[in-house]
Amino acid sequence: MLLNPLLKRSRVSSKSAIRNISLLSTRRAYHPQNVQIPRPFTKGRQTYYGLSLAGLTAAWAINSQLHAADNDANVNDDAENTVMVDKNISPFPVHIGPPKYPFSTDYSLLGYGYRYVTFISFKVYDLGIYIADQDKHLVPEVLSSKFLSTAFVDTDHSKSHKENVNAALNDSEKSAVLIGNLLDTGCRMLAKITPVRNTDFNHLKDGLVKTILAHPEAKNNQEILNSGLKELKEAFTKKGKVPKDHDLFLELQANGALQVAYYDRKKDKTFRLGLVNEPLVGKFLFSQYMGGPKPLSPTTQKSVAEHIVAML
């Protein structure tokens, strides 16, 4: 089941039950002809021993209590509905959508991880990737389609289809193709970015721009992308600081547009910031989150790949 690994990582007890997620009716069919394929981690001693043993026992008990206190900080009190990504921020919801949030539909958590600045091992934010409940059917339709499976995925006949898909999703070139084809169907996705330390809107905006420009196809689409990035910069209508544990939401809509929103945890209110209409911006951004040669967050990419395979 898709959420089992997620909830195990969030310390769900063996008694907790995970409710089933119903796949809703299909939105639109997947057409194989639209598939795109790229080109060619004595007693005195006994007394002394007894005292030593008692001391060690006492030390062990104290140490155990300290570890128990540390572990309590990571316990998720609502493990059926949330996932603990980082003990320093609020748990990520497993399901998210309206009316609390101004999204177009309901979403379920597909994978999560964190973003590090590698050269100084500096954690910047935690990242959650969600998929629209109504669009889950597109995952097996695309990744298990006869044409794509035969021509591109199931190349190792000694492995099962799931094993081949897993290998492809963890391959720098194949993952970009598979995720690209999934996004091209209009599959709605949502990214939740939660800073683990105080930052500001400019830093978040600049980070998104750099991520998009790092996409392998960015240079080949520079002119179109430039206008889209201008839209993205203008979408950040809110200025100033973004406190730790607030959220930036990026919703990839069915038509490829990207809706930017901000959740102020202190006020418990979500603000729509702006809309990016150029489809390449959202596609390149989510491609970088979910695959490609240099995924922005390797932990998130592996988590997404694992749960996509579980959906097949």
Swiss-Prot record:
Subcellular localization(s) per the UniProt record: Mitochondrion
Q: What GO terms are given for molecular function?
A: intramolecular lyase activity
Q: Which gene encodes it?
A: AIM18
Organism the protein comes from: Zygosaccharomyces rouxii (strain ATCC 2623 / CBS 732 / NBRC 1130 / NCYC 568 / NRRL Y-229)
Q: Where are the transmembrane segments?
A: none
Arranged from A to Z, the UniProt key words for this protein are: Mitochondrion, Transit peptide
Annotated protein name in UniProt? Altered inheritance of mitochondria protein 18, mitochondrial
User: Which Pfam families has this protein been placed in?
Assistant: Chalcone_2 (PF16035)
Record flagged with keyword Mitochondrion:
yes
Signal peptide region: none
Note the InterPro entries from the entry: Chalcone_isomerase (IPR016087), Chalcone_isomerase_3-sand (IPR016088), Chalcone_isomerase_sf (IPR036298)
Q: Which family does it belong to?
A: Belongs to the AIM18/AIM46 family.
Q: Where is the transit peptide?
A: 1-48
